[in-house]
């Protein structure tokens, strides 16, 4: 393993821009690390070495020409390679969503996020492993096998975006993209000592992000430092007329906020500790101790810390696991074997309805089928008002809790997860235990607000990573970066997985 791959993205970008190292060299170093380690971690579903090297060569040429002409580079991250979660469409490599039903399928169009990455001169190393259609908290629901946590290969890396987080922790990539439906960026970040951000809903385009639950899904940036995450956030955010839920608002200056925060002054910043997310069944002592230490550190930086009550958070899990399956049952109806993807039983003797049934039975995994059935039940005529409508009312109350909290504080904090990474297979047969792992993260998806997980050290219980979750109101993503960068700087360097 070369020292090059251990550098943060901002440093790599500066070296590439100064032509101290080429984008091709950096990309090749990452590809070499993937080749050397991914048999153990299985972070990637598809490695696009040729395409990544071609993109890197194009960037090197552009930098040479821009330098000669005194022009600007394509972006502040030009030439820095990236791992892309396999839920974003790409025209030059498969998009499977971790499902057999899309095995081998290549999209005819790029997602907006993919297109922005290409325009910014960021080589895409490949597509990372994930829970099937982003349904899961461990990446064990992937049809192509689980991803292993580089900190302990007997443990999960979190989910649904465990592949992207593991790729960062294993130094296979300095940058990654994930999607967050109930914590799928923040939770894996916490378990792998990386940084992950769920932006405000609607501020990063969902065009080409294959939907799990449309009102909850949000693409976002992942990296090993807060500044790197901010730089990537700036690249992918912005209004997109092709996404009907896209917010036409200015992107907050997240990079400026991260740089300001790194100076370590939080005087006047009001931080609320969410009462409902700091204790209870399932919280490990080591996680709570790490959280308490993080809050003390924030106080030492000058922040004004108080406890905040969000009473309806106690009902967020129940509401989420009615709303999400309901949207899943609708969104996944399109995967029927008729137009693209897997087709089973089409031998000339079966009807279209039979082919659809056989295709879906063979193509979807157990967790996807479970959520489709729950959602269909919740949306049925006899139960729509009793279940789905009630869940939406609770969702409104959760959003009101947050709005009320932000009248007295600027950001909220909590543990990112109740425990550190659990062992592979430990919760696979217990869906409720798996769902409870999202307890700290999913309220923000219900409200559409933004959140970050930043590493807060290693748990004294098992020496595995712990994450601090920072939350902010909609369109105040810059607050996450100011507080996160200040905490990161005060916390100091942490051990790495490798």
UniProtKB/Swiss-Prot annotation:
GO MF entry, a single one: glutaminyl-tRNA synthase (glutamine-hydrolyzing) activity
E.C. number: 6.3.5.7
Catalytic EC class: ligase
Catalytic site positions: 85, 160, 184
Sorted UniProt keywords: ATP-binding, Ligase, Nucleotide-binding, Protein biosynthesis
Presence of the UniProt keyword Protein biosynthesis in the record: yes
Annotated GO CC locations: glutamyl-tRNA(Gln) amidotransferase complex
The UniProt record lists the keyword Zinc-finger: no
Gene3D superfamilies named in the record: Amidase signature (AS) domain (3.90.1300.10)
Catalytic activity: L-glutamyl-tRNA(Gln) + L-glutamine + ATP + H2O = L-glutaminyl-tRNA(Gln) + L-glutamate + ADP + phosphate + H(+)
PROSITE patterns noted in UniProt: AMIDASES (PS00571)
GO biological process per UniProt: translation
Record-linked Pfam families: Amidase
Family statement: Belongs to the amidase family. GatA subfamily.
Role, per record: Allows the formation of correctly charged Gln-tRNA(Gln) through the transamidation of misacylated Glu-tRNA(Gln) in organisms which lack glutaminyl-tRNA synthetase. The reaction takes place in the presence of glutamine and ATP through an activated gamma-phospho-Glu-tRNA(Gln).
PANTHER family per UniProt: GLUTAMYL-TRNA(GLN) AMIDOTRANSFERASE SUBUNIT A (PTHR11895:SF151), TRANSAMIDASE (PTHR11895)
Subunit organization: Heterotrimer of A, B and C subunits.
Name of the protein: Glutamyl-tRNA(Gln) amidotransferase subunit A
Organism: Mycolicibacterium vanbaalenii (strain DSM 7251 / JCM 13017 / BCRC 16820 / KCTC 9966 / NRRL B-24157 / PYR-1)
Organism ancestry: Bacteria, Bacillati, Actinomycetota, Actinomycetes, Mycobacteriales
């Amino acid at each position: 393993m070369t020292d090059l791959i251990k550098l943060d993205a901002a440093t790599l970008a500066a070296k590439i821009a100064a032509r101290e190292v080429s984008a091709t060299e950096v990309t090749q170093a990452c590809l070499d690390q993937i080749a050397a380690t991914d048999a153990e971690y299985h972070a990637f579903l598809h490695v696009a070495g040729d395409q990544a090297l071609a993109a890197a060569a194009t960037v090197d040429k552009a930098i040479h020409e821009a330098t000669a002409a005194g022009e600007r580079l394509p972006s502040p991250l030009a030439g820095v390679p990236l791992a892309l979660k396999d839920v974003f469409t790409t025209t030059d490599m498969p998009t499977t969503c971790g499902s057999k039903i899309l095995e081998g399928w290549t999209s005819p169009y790029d997602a907006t996020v993919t297109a922005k990455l290409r325009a910014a001169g960021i080589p895409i190393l490949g597509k990372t492993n994930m829970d099937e259609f982003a349904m899961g908290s461990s990446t064990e629901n992937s049809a192509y096998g689980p991803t292993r946590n580089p900190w302990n290969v007997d443990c999960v890396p979190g989910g649904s975006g465990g592949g992207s987080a593991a790729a960062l922790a294993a130094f296979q990539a300095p940058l990654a993209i994930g999607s967050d439906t109930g914590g799928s960026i923040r939770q894996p970040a916490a378990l792998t000592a990386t940084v992950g951000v769920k932006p405000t809903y609607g501020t990063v385009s969902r065009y080409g992000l294959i939907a799990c639950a449309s009102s909850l899904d949000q693409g976002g940036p992942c990296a090993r430092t807060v500044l790197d995450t901010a730089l990537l956030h700036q690249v992918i955010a912005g209004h997109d007329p092709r996404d009907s839920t896209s917010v036409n608002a200015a992107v907050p200056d997240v990079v400026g906020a991260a740089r300001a925060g790194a100076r370590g002054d939080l005087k006047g910043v009001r931080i609320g500790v969410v009462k409902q997310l700091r204790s209870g069944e399932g919280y490990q002592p080591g996680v709570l101790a790490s959280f308490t230490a993080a809050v003390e550190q924030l106080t030492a930086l000058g922040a004004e810390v108080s406890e905040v009550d969000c009473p309806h958070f106690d009902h967020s899990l129940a509401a989420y696991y009615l709303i999400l399956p309901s949207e899943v049952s609708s969104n996944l109806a399109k995967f029927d074997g008729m137009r693209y993807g897997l087709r089973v039983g089409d031998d000339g003797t079966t009807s279209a309805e039979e082919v659809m049934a056989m295709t879906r039975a063979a193509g979807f995994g157990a967790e996807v089928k479970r959520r489709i059935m729950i959602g269909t039940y919740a949306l049925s005529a006899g139960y729509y008002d009793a279940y789905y409508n009630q869940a939406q009312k609770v969702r409104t109350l959760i959003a009101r809790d947050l709005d009320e909290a932000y009248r007295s504080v600027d950001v909220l904090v909590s543990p990112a997860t109740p425990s550190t990474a659990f062992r592979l297979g430990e919760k696979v047969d217990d869906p409720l235990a798996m769902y409870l792992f999202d307890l700290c993260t999913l309220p923000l998806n219900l409200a559409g607000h933004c959140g970050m997980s930043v590493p807060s050290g290693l748990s004294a219980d098992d020496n595995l990573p712990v994450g601090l979750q920072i939350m902010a109101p909609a369109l105040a993503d810059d607050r996450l970066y100011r507080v996160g960068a200040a905490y990161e700087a005060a916390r100091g360097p942490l051990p790495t997985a490798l």
